[in-house]
């Protein structure tokens, strides 16, 4: 049954992956920054100096800038149609009258988690491979930490967007809600007392790069929240009428 | 033995009381049609049977289980919306079902797809409504189920394909049980062993078609007469005639005795019965 879910996800998974690989390639190819980017930055001498360091460049430009912005978007693209499209297109009837709801739910959620996590693991490890190919001087021991932060953050967003997908009978609402969450999360970070709600610094692996290692409290908090969201999603799906 | 048993089923959509305490029994090996106009509550009743909708009140038992989820592998359902995954081709749809459905016969599905002359490798998204219906039926009929539930299975099909589908459904009876909804009377007359007529959330008749034709009668009067409500199903006012619809020999005799020599008894066909039950009292002059 998970194979059927994988087939449904295959095109968007491939497109996301290709976009991300293209992004990674572009940041390698564009190094050092073209003149117009340097002009845009003004005179951030320290930043430009840091960017000359392979380790800083790779972390800041990939984990801290590109990948971190894509993590919620990848989760949204994977999760939003998982349930809502079945309801909108009427295919949910085929599934629910041939398989118990628990099996339908588990196969959809597990496939989503698997695809999301697999992609994020690959996209977190790929830069290490690129750096090795280009003989850049990077600290490879930090990559497991970056990967863990990225995957846990992505899992949280995926669980949240899965819930949106379950709550919606069309595909537009989960996309709109997802975009609101993505933007809202970054805005919340601007308010000091609510800074902890901003998941982006965690997903960027800031603590790992700074040498403080994995932020275990945040990691477990996100995992617990993800489980709770999936449990809420299950009860909603179990009792939903179609 | 009854494959489906429903007792006192109620279903509300907000304030709308869609199904009003219905009872239903479907015998094993029979083709049982639920006949009713649009909005009568047929689809809602079926969805409650299959666990897609949760009834507010009432008991439901399907294939001996009060939890439809436990017997899903023995049920094949064709919903009103015959939508399948549009990115698949019929051949890929068969493979999809093979992985997903427990008692599925892929060779039978392919055989049916060929019989319907559907393009095997074209995307379902490019199919017409009729073609999608035929594909859905091919997939549903390839299930080795004990109970087949069809919700308006021939809607949108041309007359030739419709007859083929009706023959296929007819062939299922005996070993398999078929529960079938329709608002197309000739179809029901052609294939159903038993019929339940549903109007405004209630069943107004359960029984065999022949029994219905035998028991429902028109009593025609030249002028309007006063009849007790417990004796008549409906009355129809027409120019120069007042018609009462009665059910059963007892009621027929009682009405005749009330106006001796003034009542003329006429036979009713299924369409007459259906129309009088659906419309209830009517004034055709208005």
Regions found by a protein language model. Name each.
Chain A
Residues 20-21, 25-28, 48-69, 105-166, ...:
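Secretory targeting signals
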Residues 4, 85, 128, 132, ...:
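Transmembrane helix-loop junction
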Residues 77-96, 109:
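Transmembrane helix boundary and interhelical loop/hinge segments in multi-pass membrane proteins
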Residues 59-85:
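Long, hydrophobic alpha-helical segments
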């Amino acid at each position: 049954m998970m194979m059927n879910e994988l087939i449904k996800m295959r095109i968007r998974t491939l497109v996301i992956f290709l976009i991300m690989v293209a992004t990674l390639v572009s940041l390698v190819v564009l190094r050092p920054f073209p003149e117009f980017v340097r002009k845009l930055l003004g005179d951030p001498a320290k930043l430009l100096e840091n960017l000359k360091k392979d380790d800083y460049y790779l972390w800041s430009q990939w984990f801290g800038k590109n990948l971190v912005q894509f993590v919620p978007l990848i989760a949204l693209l994977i999760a939003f149609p998982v349930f809502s499209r079945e309801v909108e297109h009427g295919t949910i009837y085929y599934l629910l009258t041939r398989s118990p709801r628990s099996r339908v739910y588990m196969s959809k959620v597990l496939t989503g988690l698997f695809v999301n996590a697999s992609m994020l693991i690959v996209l977190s490890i790929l830069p290490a491979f690129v750096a090795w190919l280009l003989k850049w001087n990077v600290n490879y021991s930090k990559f497991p930490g970056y990967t863990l932060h990225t995957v846990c953050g992505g899992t949280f967003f995926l669980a949240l967007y899965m819930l949106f997908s379950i709550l919606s009978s069309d595909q537009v609402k989960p996309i709109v809600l997802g975009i609101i969450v993505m933007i809202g999360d970054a805005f919340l970070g601007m308010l000091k007392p609510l800074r902890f709600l901003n998941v982006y610094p965690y997903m960027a692996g800031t603590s790992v790069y700074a040498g403080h290692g994995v932020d275990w409290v945040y990691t477990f908090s996100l995992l617990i929240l993800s489980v709770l969201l999936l449990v809420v999603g299950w009860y909603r799906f179990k009792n939903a009428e179609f | 033995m009854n494959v489906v048993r429903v007792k006192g089923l109620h279903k509300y959509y907000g304030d709308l009381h869609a199904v009003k305490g219905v009872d239903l029994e479907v015998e094993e090996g029979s083709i049982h049609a639920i006949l009713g106009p649009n909005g009568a509550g047929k689809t809602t009743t079926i969805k409650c049977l299959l666990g897609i909708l949760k009834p507010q009140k009432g008991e439901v038992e399907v294939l001996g289980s009060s939890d439809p989820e436990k017997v899903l592998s023995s049920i094949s359902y064709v919903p009103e919306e015959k939508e399948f995954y549009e990115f698949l081709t019929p051949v890929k749809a068969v493979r999809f079902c093979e992985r997903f459905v427990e008692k599925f016969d892929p060779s039978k599905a392919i055989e049916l797809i060929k019989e319907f002359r559907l393009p095997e490798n074209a995307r379902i998204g490019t199919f017409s409504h009729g073609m999608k219906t035929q594909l859905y039926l091919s997939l549903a009929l390839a299930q080795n189920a004990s109970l087949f539930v069809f919700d308006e299975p021939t809607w949108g099909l041309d007359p030739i394909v419709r007859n083929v589908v009706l023959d296929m459904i007819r062939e299922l009876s005996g070993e398999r049980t078929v529960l079938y909804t329709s608002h197309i009377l000739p179809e029901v007359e052609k294939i159903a062993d038993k019929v339940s007529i549903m109007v405004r959330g209630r069943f107004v008749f359960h029984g065999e078609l022949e029994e219905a034709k035998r028991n429902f009668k028109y009593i025609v009067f030249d002028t309007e007469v006063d009849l007790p409500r417990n004796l008549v199903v409906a009355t129809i006012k027409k120019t120069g005639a007042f018609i009462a619809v009665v059910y059963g020999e007892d009621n027929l005799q009682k009405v005749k005795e009330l106006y001796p020599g003034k009542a003329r008894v006429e036979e009713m066909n299924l369409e007459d019965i259906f129309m009088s039950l659906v419309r209830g009292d009517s004034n055709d002059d208005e």
